[in-house]
């Protein structure tokens, strides 16, 4: 139920040494997405609304894990994002045990090219404020598994998997030595997996020292939205996932 904080991960400072003098840089960021859902889902030909806020998702959550990472050398780099969530609580209705479960996995991977960095101030000797722009390309794999087990009745389950190509861009603003802003967007699907998918992310981060290296960690937060419109099958076998997931994000980015 809950994709890429990678839009925040590669917040490189304009004060750092030139790209040609750097080796590989690696960053990893565990995070949490306080997600809500809006849209509709069709399963076995039956359509239903899924307008759900984060409080309901939290109540139904069994386990979740989210991490993003990236690496860069010079102008080229690669990034990834992994999300897994297991939802559904057993309950008894009229003396009958009902066990619904939903498992969701998103795995995103791709690359980026640094188009350039431009200073936004003429202050002598200052590397900030500045803006860095990257072009993004990659793919997102989506796995959905729903299971409904009703005591005394047949178990019903549904599995869906698809892969969406993605293209996008991000702008990374170094506002000061410690503060930064990120704007990220991508589109994809194009009928390969989803008919269409899009993502937007706006975040702000604060750099600080962790262990012995200066400014090697950042607390990052913001707001993220992802839309997917995926269809498969027809008639009583039709499945459709026309859903927007959105909500605040909060994470800790660490340079390795």
Residue ranges and their predicted role:
Residues 180-195:
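Transmembrane beta-strand segments that form the barrel wall of outer-membrane beta-barrel proteins
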Residues 32-36, 73-75, 82-88, 106, ...:
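Transmembrane beta-strands of outer-membrane beta-barrel pores
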Residues 13-84, 249, 255:
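Short glycine/proline- and aromatic-enriched beta-strand/turn motifs that initiate or cap beta-hairpins
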Residues 28-30, 67-73, 109-113, 137-139, ...:
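Residues on the lipid-exposed face of transmembrane beta-strands in outer-membrane beta-barrel proteins
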Residues 22-24, 61-65, 72, 103-107, ...:
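Residues that define the transmembrane beta-barrel architecture of outer-membrane proteins
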């Amino acid at each position: 139920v809950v994709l890429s904080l990678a839009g925040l991960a590669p917040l490189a400072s304009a004060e750092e040494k030139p790209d040609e003098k750097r080796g590989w840089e690696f960053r990893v960021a565990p995070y949490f997405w306080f997600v809500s859902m809006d849209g509709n889902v069709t399963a076995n030909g039956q359509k239903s609304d899924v307008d759900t806020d984060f409080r309901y998702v939290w109540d139904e959550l069994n386990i979740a894990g989210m991490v993003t990472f990236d690496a860069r050398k010079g102008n080229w780099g690669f990034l990834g994002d992994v999300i897994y969530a297991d939802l559904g609580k057993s309950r008894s209705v009229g003396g009958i045990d009902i066990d619904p479960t939903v498992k969701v996995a998103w795995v995103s991977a791709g690359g980026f090219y640094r188009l350039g960095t431009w200073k936004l101030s003429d202050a002598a000797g200052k590397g900030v404020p500045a803006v860095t722009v990257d072009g993004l390309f990659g793919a997102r794999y989506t796995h959905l598994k729903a299971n409904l087990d009703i005591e005394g009745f047949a178990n019903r389950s549904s599995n869906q998997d698809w892969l969406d190509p993605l293209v996008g861009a991000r702008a990374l603003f170094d506002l000061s030595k410690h503060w930064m802003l990120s704007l990220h967007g991508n589109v994809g699907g194009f009928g390969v997996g989803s008919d269409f998918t899009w993502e937007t992310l706006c975040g702000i981060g604060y750099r600080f020292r962790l262990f012995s290296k200066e400014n090697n960690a950042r607390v990052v937060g913001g707001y993220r939205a992802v839309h997917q419109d995926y269809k498969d099958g027809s008639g009583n076998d039709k499945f459709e996932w026309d859903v927007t997931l959105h909500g605040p994000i909060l994470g800790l980015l660490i340079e390795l």
